[in-house]
Amino acid sequence: MMSTHPKPSYRRILLKLSGEALMGDEPFGIDAKVLDRMAQEIKELVELGVQVGLVIGGGNLFRGEGLAKAGMNRVVGDHMGMLATVMNGLAMRDALHRAFVNARLMSAIELTGVCDSYNWAEAISLLKSGRVVIFSAGTGNPFFTTDSAACLRGIEIEAEVVLKGTKVDGVYSDDPVSNPDATLYKHINYDDILEKQLKVMDLAAFTLARDHALPIRVFNMNKPGALRAVIMGEEEGTLISKNAE
């Protein structure tokens, strides 16, 4: 007998969440309600049989630009940013555990007793066994964003797509906040993004994805059900890939 349940379009994904997404309506830090909602949405994916790798930014806890302008060394600022992503990772791991989802937190910098150090083979093995793996501390190197970390880990774990959860519905022709006439792209290729100078990710992250033909889907993480819709192959957000037919 054929199953009537629709199957997910992806088997293994890398989900990138901005630190700001965790703030919700708070001016700073982590909004517990948002954290729990995201944990529930991730739980839905796990229950559908999707293998989930997760990278979270740190902008809700630490922003290096202001301190850099005041003279702080960029490397020091980036190290602080990496630790902010570990704090977000700890919060997310805890939220997932409270939602009865098995999750493991890995860090690109060694933090004995707090979380595991990043190990590629172990990450693959955990994903295969249905655990959510949270990759924190970025790439472990300064001058690289968490978007670069998301693309790097996505390539390493052979994710089929990087899903970038943002505060807007996808990639627009212009800033939708300042220009209400900006149009939302449904499907666009890497070269068009570069040519039109659309802000999706920093160049290092974006070219890494392009060079490895890793598709990126940008969607609104604050829209309930959007993540599931993406996983089920619906036209949610913007798909960036090699060909945009």
UniProtKB/Swiss-Prot annotation:
The keyword Cell inner membrane does not apply. It comes from the Bacteria. ATP binds at K16, L17, S18, G19, G59, R63, T166, Y172, D175. Pathway: Pyrimidine metabolism; CTP biosynthesis via de novo pathway; UDP from UMP (UMPK route): step 1/1. It catalyses: UMP + ATP = UDP + ADP. Keywords: ATP-binding, Cytoplasm, Kinase, Nucleotide-binding, Pyrimidine biosynthesis, Transferase. One of its GO terms (biological process) is UDP biosynthetic process. GO terms for molecular function: ATP binding; UMP kinase activity. Inhibited by UTP. GO terms for cellular component: cytosol. It is found in: Cytoplasm. The keyword Membrane does not apply. CDD domains: AAK_UMPK-PyrH-Ec. Its EC number is 2.7.4.22. UMP binds at G58, D78, T139, G140, N141, P142, F143, F144, T145, T146. Catalyzes the reversible phosphorylation of UMP to UDP. Homohexamer. Belongs to the UMP kinase family. NCBIfam families: pyrH_bact. This is Uridylate kinase. It comes from Idiomarina loihiensis (strain ATCC BAA-735 / DSM 15497 / L2-TR). The lineage of its organism: Bacteria, Pseudomonadati, Pseudomonadota, Gammaproteobacteria, Alteromonadales. The gene is pyrH.
